[in-house]
Amino acid sequence: MRLALLSDLHANLQALDACLSHARSQGADRFAFLGDLVGYGADPVGVLDQVMAMQAQGAWVLQGNHDAMAVMPPTGDVSMGASTGTWTHAQLNEAQRHFLAHLPLTDTVDHVLLVHASADKPEAWRYVDGERAARVCLDAAKADGLARVLAPHVLVGHVHHQTLYYQGAGRGLMPFKPTPGVGIPLPRSRACVVTVGSVGQPRDGDPRAMYALYDMSAGRLTFHRVPYDHAAAAQAIRQAGLPEHFAHRLETGR
């Protein structure tokens, strides 16, 4: 199985289309969406149409915090993120809201745990943003029975950057920053936590979309960066009347 891992799409249809096309060109035959399908971006309907169709064909799909926000926008929150949640809610029909509301927070594929945020209380939307947080995430996956093996691979989104935290000689997890397109051996015997990056809103100074491809048969993980028409995605945000900050973020990757 070659499993394409896509997270934090954020209603960016241009980026999603580019990543799906690239993943298929790399031999991806299964797909997993790790949450935050909507929010920030201008095309939640187009993105959900694609993801819902792919779920019907066997894709794994999880709920992220922005998906939950689109179902039930917060009241009294005047932040830019909350305002896009309210806008997104208004764009969706009842079937799309029902779809988002009933997505699971976690799922498993063989020895792999899929989760949007940390496996430590997934509903709290905690970030895996360093070695300590990765250790807490991995320990929670083992202790709570979310992973069915002693050396699980925990694959997460939420943080909008790509890092592999792998089990070293001791108990600690070591961070590794990948080179796009270069495969990394990922044996089942070594526990790890992987942040797969963001399809629809990169934040590391590179506007190219991110996803990862896990060849489970070969035990190899490859992180990818994919160019797409981020100018068109940014212009769509402006035309929708959403905050300029989110358009600028797509153009700069920050």
Regions found by a protein language model. Give the residues of each.
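N-terminal active-site segment of His-dependent metallophosphoesterases
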Residues: 1-57
